Structures are given as structure tokens and as C-alpha cells.
């Protein structure tokens, strides 16, 4: 029996988070060809809206869906925005590493928070077509755009990159692109019309984001345009501290172990919202500290 136990123990190994999602892609919203396309569009558009709003830029987003192989349901998705762009050295982490992001530890309202979404799109595209995702990024301080093909090593949760370089990025009218991001990816998915469709998602997105201009080109070449109806950006979202009522006991224990505060009252005031000096004293008196 001990030999069997040792053999079973030797077969156990830690699984990378990206390898887990590769085998359980339905957890990321890629559970059917129709929903997979909507999920990919949502993740890319959410990233564009968040980036533009954080940089205080009125969003202009272009989405294009093309059918490359109708028999195999291979679709190409292109999403372009006028956001601040991503520095070249950060592209591979943003697109090729799960749980990489700037908002995971911050308590604030935002569309993307877990650092999974767009990397999940890269992974699903690679899984279903074997092709990397092409990224083009231009930041305002540079004259040319960075371009790179991004894949994902699921065993290491690390990006693989190829064809990296720089190029001039111009609009269709020949004007230079000042800043922005373009993501081009191919995946096994289906485009459909109606309620559960990319068109419907983008239409609803334009309604709840009146400050955004969204243009969608469908597989038939028809262009759908939702213009910006206000020049006013939403108020800037600030991070807040947690409230004592909203955390679990284990979280409190971890915060206490990591704190450098010498007094519990100081810890309460500096780490939580809604805790004044008076409230901290009342709380400590109730628990006899």
C-alpha cells in the first residue's frame, strides 16, 4: 500500500493557472462558438474603454469581424482604439500573462479587474487556430508604433512573441496616428445576428457609454455606427480602502500580519474606510482591547 501511495504522490504536480484555463476555457466565457466571439469582443472593448477613461480620452473604438473560413468557422476580429497605447516592453505581459493587471488589488469600479480577459482571448485564439494575436501599439511620446505577434506558453503562464518591430501607423486619410492600440486575432467562432450578437452587445455598450464613439463592420461589410452623444467623460474612479464589514476574517488576519503599525487603533484608521479615531476606540472597547 505504501508503494501505491508513493506512486500516486509522485504523479502529483502543480498546474499553472494558464494551463488550467486552457483545459477549462468555458470558465472564461469560451463555451460555444457564438459566445466565444461575443466574449472576445467584450474583453477587447472593455479594455479600450477602461484605458481611454483612465487617460481622460474620449473613446473612439472600431470593431471589425471577418469570416476567413466558413466551413471551419474561422473568424478574424480586429479592435482598434484611440487610447494611450501600451509601452512596447509591457505588451507581452498584458496580452500573454494571466493575472497580470493594475486593478486586481484596487477596490474601485472598473470593467476589467482580474487580469484574465484579453489574455484569455489570446489563449483561445491560439488553442483553436494555432495562430498568435497581432498587436500594434502607439504611445504619444514615440513616432512609430510597436508591432508584435503574441502567443501564450500555458505551462509557464508566459508570453511567446515573434515578428516584433516598429512601423509607421497612419489613418485611412493618411494622417499619423497619435496614440492607440489595435488587436487582430483569429479564432474558431460563429457570427450571428439578433439578440445574442456582437451587434447587440455593441449597441448596448454605446447606450451605457454615451461618451464613446463605436463603429462596427460586420462580416457582410455593412458598417454600423453609434456616434458619441456627449463630450463629457465619466468622473474619474478613485481607489478606496475596504470597510471592516466587507472583509473576511482571513483577510483581516493577513492584513494584521503584514502591517507595520504598532497600535491596533492606528491600523484600523489607516487601513479601512469609515473608521475614525472615535469609531476605532469604540470598537476596541467592545472587544476589550
Question: Locations of the language-model features?
Answer:
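Short beta-strand/loop element within the Bergerat-fold HATPase_c
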Residues: 60-70
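Conserved small/polar residues in nucleotide/adenosyl-binding loops
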Residues: 287-289
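A short glycine-centered beta->alpha linker in the GHKL/HATPase_c
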Residues: 85-87
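Short, highly conserved beta-strand within the GHKL-type HATPase_c fold
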Residues: 70-78
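Conserved short strand/loop->alpha-helix "switch" segment adjacent to the catalytic nucleotide/phosphoryl-transfer site
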Residues: 20-42
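GHKL-type ATPase core
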Residues: 4-5, 76, 89-90, 101-246
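Conserved ATP-binding N-box helix of the HATPase_c
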Residues: 34-61, 119-122
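Acidic ATP/Mg2+-coordinating residue in the GHKL
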Residues: 81
Amino acid at each position: 500500500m505504501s508503494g501505491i501511495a508513493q506512486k500516486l504522490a509522485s504523479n502529483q504536480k502543480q498546474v499553472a493557472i494558464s494551463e488550467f484555463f486552457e483545459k477549462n476555457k468555458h470558465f472564461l466565457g469560451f463555451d460555444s462558438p457564438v459566445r466565444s466571439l461575443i466574449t472576445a469582443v467584450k474583453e477587447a472593448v472593455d479594455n479600450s474603454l477602461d484605458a481611454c477613461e483612465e487617460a481622460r480620452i474620449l473613446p473612439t473604438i472600431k470593431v471589425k469581424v471577418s469570416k476567413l473560413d466558413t466551413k471551419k468557422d474561422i473568424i478574424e476580429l480586429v479592435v482598434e482604439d484611440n487610447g494611450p497605447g501600451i509601452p512596447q516592453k509591457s505588451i507581452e505581459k498584458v496580452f500573454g500573462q494571466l493575472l497580470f493587471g493594475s486593478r486586481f488589488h484596487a477596490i474601485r469600479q472598473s470593467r476589467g479587474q482580474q487580469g484574465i480577459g484579453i489574455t484569455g482571448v489570446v489563449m483561445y485564439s491560439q488553442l483553436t487556430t494555432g495562430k498568435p494575436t497581432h498587436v500594434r501599439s502607439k504611445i504619444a511620446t514615440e513616432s512609430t508604433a510597436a508591432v508584435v505577434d503574441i502567443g501564450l506558453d500555458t505551462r509557464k503562464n508566459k508570453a511567446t512573441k515573434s515578428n516584433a518591430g516598429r512601423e509607421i501607423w497612419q489613418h485611412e486619410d493618411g494622417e499619423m496616428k497619435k496614440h492607440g492600440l489595435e488587436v487582430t486575432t483569429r479564432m474558431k467562432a460563429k457570427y450571428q445576428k439578433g439578440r445574442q450578437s456582437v451587434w447587440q452587445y455593441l449597441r448596448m455598450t454605446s447606450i451605457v457609454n454615451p461618451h464613446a464613439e463605436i463603429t462596427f463592420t460586420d462580416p457582410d461589410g455593412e458598417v454600423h455606427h453609434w456616434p458619441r452623444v456627449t463630450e463629457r467623460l465619466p468622473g474619474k474612479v478613485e481607489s478606496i480602502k475596504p470597510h471592516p464589514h466587507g472583509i473576511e476574517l482571513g483577510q483581516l488576519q493577513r492584513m494584521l500580519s503584514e502591517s507595520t503599525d504598532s497600535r491596533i487603533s492606528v491600523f484600523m484608521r489607516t487601513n479601512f474606510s469609515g473608521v475614525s479615531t472615535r469609531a476605532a476606540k469604540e470598537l476596541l472597547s467592545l472587544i476589550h482591547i
